[in-house]
Amino acid sequence: MRLMHLGKESHWIWDDTTPGMHEGDLFIATNGSGQIGHITYVVEQAKKAGATVAVVTGSPKQTCPQMADFTLFVPAAVFNGTDDRAVPSIQPMGNLFEQHLYMLFDIIIMMLEEKMQVSHEEMEKRHRNIE
């Protein structure tokens, strides 16, 4: 969503209006445990289509992250995953990992906003206006 607000063409993979993936496209996936079946399958399909794949994970040694062109390791406790470097949490399941994702992607958007010289006002103009 925020990539679109920055003026980039972006789509959510599960939306029926998402176009086909091709060489030159970037597919970004999050897979905390690195072994979520449907995410691993979609990453495999993106690779077959020629897309560049980036996976954000808490378990970089698992199958899905190993298939990626780029892997970003978030050292936080994940649901059904293990990594000796993960920060433990008293929170249930993958909450810590998910919270880190929100912060990580927010920081990435702010960095892109600065690099692309896009203002908050420009981004707001691209926000839907029918809610």
Task: Mark where each language-model region is.
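A short, charged, Gly/Pro-tolerant segment at domain boundaries
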Residues: 107, 113-131
